[in-house]
Amino acid sequence: MEMATKKCNIFGVDSIGEPEGVVKKALDESLSLLDIFKFIEITNFDLDPIMTNWFWQVMVNNHSTHLGRVVLEWFGYEGEDSNQKQKFIDMLKRNKIPYKQLKHTDNEIELYPSIKEEMTLLPHKGAIASSKWLVMEPFNIKMAMLRLNTKNADIIKRYYIKMEELIRLYAQYTTLFQKREKETMSREMLDLRLMMEDMKITNHRQENMLIESHNMLRSMGVEIKDIRHENNDLLDQNNELLERVDDVLQKVNTVQKKLDISVEDRAPQPDKNTRRERFLLLKRNNDTFPYYTIRAQEINARKALKRQRNMYTDVTVLLDIVCHPNTKTFYVRIKDDLKSKGVEFNLCEINISNSNIDEAILVKEMMKINDKKRDV
């Protein structure tokens, strides 16, 4: 019988099976990723608190570390400071483990605050001049710890093994945390995509129904201004809602990329051109409101322009501003500026017959407002 093999990461962590008890406790504790020290606190992981921080720095740093009296005592060396250090150095020499001793004249001492602190405790300059401070690379410290033959040797080695166990558990925790984040993100993206598809279908049906209704009324010789205004307003609201959903979907995709999560069945990235904002000013053969504005993303702007040309026999584009960062805010500024000149606004429609400007000035004023975005 062949043994079943489990797919694990480089730490031997299985992301498919059930998490271990302490890992499950950490996952249930917070929706945010815990750092390793918070993980130790939450799981009550058994570690010697005296040397945890120092030993962790040795494991993760890639520069030399100062081994002073506190460290040597923790290693199990007894007696005067000089005797402790000499016994430790003798052990290093026997096992051919590299080390370095710094003098007070070495510029490298500036890298070790603990050495500078010890220097301030020495009684006089002569003591400082005769002193040396022991520093070692992280790899060599680990080698030395495994060679210890002091009263604390077994404690040190057990501590080393516990640290390896901690790394393994924390690796399992981070693996399962990212797996959970990926699943949550996938569900949210699927819900958004389904909602967007439903809205697109509904919007398409409404557009077809409105066009059919308008064509039927025109064939009957009926002109219902209020219905037309309501229909245009409804279509604009639908388009704006679709654009907001599209923006949310893009933000979800951006978050997922930052998590470095690969999801096979995800919503496609939106086409850059179709997301560009357009502002159009139209002139139609409408006696009451001859001017009409379209404010939407590229794809929705094209649809709105097509609707206007289906509704009127004479439609001219007087102004077409592409890639405006916010056409909604732009239109608000236009209304604020031109209402003072007597221009009448009704949703997207404009009437200048009772104002003190003509068509040329209307276009010029809108261009002037648009150009203000460059005045930074």
UniProtKB/Swiss-Prot annotation:
Q: Which UniProt keywords apply?
A: Coiled coil
Tell me yes or no: is Zinc-finger among this UniProt entry's keywords: no
Which positions are tagged coiled coil?
Answer: 178-261
Specify one Pfam family.
MSV199
Source species, domain of life: Viruses
Q: Does the keyword Coiled coil apply?
A: yes
**Name this protein carries in UniProt:** Putative MSV199 domain-containing protein 468L
Origin species: Invertebrate iridescent virus 6 (IIV-6)
| Phylogenetic placement of the source organism | Viruses, Varidnaviria, Bamfordvirae, Nucleocytoviricota, Megaviricetes
